[in-house]
Amino acid sequence: MQGYTKDQPGQKNLYRDVIDDLQQISENVGNKTFYHKFGSKVEPIKENEIAKATKPGFYICNESQAKCNNQETRLELPFKAAKANKDATYVIVTDLFLSSKQLVGSTLGSLTKPLKSILKDEKSIGIVGVMSSFNGNIYDIPKKDGGTFKYTEAKKRPFYIIIIGDQKNIN
């Protein structure tokens, strides 16, 4: 996600504007707004720190790779939280980039099961894609012959806003 925070010459950066707008909008929906970041785990963010999500430093971890929360995207974690707290409205901003192992077998089920349950509970799920400038690395791109590589030439890339909750809060 860090690549969305850095300007790309000649490209419009929408990420910062959208994050600012989402913060204002979310404070008008429901009684209380909670912010979290997620990678391999979900961590709370204080309301006065949310603006840091628009800066590259927010995504940097100075710990060992094993201790860093930015080494994978566990998108099923906020989905499980949304399933557990049925009265809340969840707004998730993600690049929707999943590793190939997350898209097969039981791991795929851990992603789809909470979504199916949310829909069965008559909640709505809205997804909006936003094409924005991108200036960073895209990791774990699968190779045809196996393995992965890092792509560094992207100038634009979409990010996604996933909204889960009552339909009246999503429209």
How would you label these PLM feature ranges?
Residues 2-8, 43-48, 99-108, 135-140, ...:
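Extracytoplasmic/secreted cell-surface and envelope-processing proteins
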Residues 8-22, 57, 61-79, 103-117:
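Well-ordered, non-membrane alpha-helical segments in soluble/globular domains
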Residues 1-94, 98-99, 125-133:
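Von Willebrand factor
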Residues 23-30, 83-84, 98, 120:
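Sec-exported extracytoplasmic/periplasmic mature domains
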Residues 159, 168-171:
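Long, low-hydrophobicity ectodomains and other hydrophilic envelope-associated domains
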Residues 97-162:
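VWA/integrin I-like adhesion module and closely mimicked acidic/polar interface patches used
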